[in-house]
């Protein structure tokens, strides 16, 4: 049985245009719909405006970093938002322990540079 990814929407929170565009293209090739946030200030606004199935969260985004955004998502009153899988993306994974990621509410994480096969595998693991 194949999973219909066309009904799945992924929010990509990333300030690097190069990484944002590559990630978007890879996921669009898998038939996911994409919503974008270029900084931490846009993340909750996008989540409240558009239902999504998963968040790819750059940890080092401007305005509010990814850890703060993740905490705010987890504290949100709406279970459709606060229960979302959040996959952290970071080039500084060594700066954080898995305990810190878990404490913030991160579901999983991927290191940069992104391995796009791993990206697709992890997204499918959480949203199909």
Regions inferred by a protein language model and the residue ranges of each:
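C-terminal output helix
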Residues: 114-123
């Amino acid at each position: 049985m194949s999973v219909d990814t066309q009904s799945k929407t992924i929010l990509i929170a990333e300030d690097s245009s190069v990484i944002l565009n590559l990630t978007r293209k890879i996921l669009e090739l898998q038939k996911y719909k994409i919503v974008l946030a270029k900084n931490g200030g846009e993340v909750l606004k996008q989540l409240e405006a558009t239902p999504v199935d998963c968040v790819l969260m750059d940890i080092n985004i401007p305005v509010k970093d990814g850890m703060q955004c993740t905490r705010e998502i987890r504290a949100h009153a709406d279970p459709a938002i606060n229960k979302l899988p959040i996959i952290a993306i970071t080039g500084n994974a060594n700066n954080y322990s898995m305990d810190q990621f878990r404490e913030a509410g991160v579901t999983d994480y991927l290191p940069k540079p992104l391995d796009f096969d791993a990206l697709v595998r992890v997204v499918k693991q959480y949203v199909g």
